[in-house]
Swiss-Prot record:
Residues 42-70 are annotated as: Disordered. It is a single-pass membrane protein. Residues 57-70 have a biased composition (Basic and acidic residues). Its main location: membrane. Keywords: Cell inner membrane, Cell membrane, Membrane, Protein transport, Translocation, Transmembrane, Transmembrane helix, Transport. The Tat system comprises two distinct complexes: a TatABC complex, containing multiple copies of TatA, TatB and TatC subunits, and a separate TatA complex, containing only TatA subunits. Substrates initially bind to the TatABC complex, which probably triggers association of the separate TatA complex to form the active translocon. This is Sec-independent protein translocase protein TatA. Gene3D superfamilies: 1.20.5.3310. GO terms for cellular component: TAT protein transport complex. It comes from Methylococcus capsulatus (strain ATCC 33009 / NCIMB 11132 / Bath). It comes from the Bacteria. The keyword Membrane applies. Pfam families: TatA_B_E. Belongs to the TatA/E family.
Length: 70
């Protein structure tokens, strides 16, 4: 009991009548442009290494009690 082909076709025709072909074309173009911009932003983000990433610290671990004795 899902949506069949005829129901989808009827829904498309109703949307076409309500909005018109020109408006649907504009909406489709805007949606495509938004998706393209989103993909470009995601690929740019993957190319850049993060500056706030993890750093390796080197040194000697000293117990606080031993430090006070010296």
């Amino acid at each position: 009991m899902g949506i069949g082909v005829w129901e989808l076709l009827l829904l498309f025709l109703i949307v076409l009548v309500v909005f018109g072909t020109k408006r649907l074309r504009n909406i489709g173009g805007d949606l495509g442009g938004a998706i393209k911009s989103f993909r470009q932003a995601m690929s740019e983000n993957e190319d850049k290494p993060s500056e706030g990433g993890a750093r390796t610290l080197e040194g000697e671990v000293v117990d606080k009690k031993e430090k006070d004795k010296v």
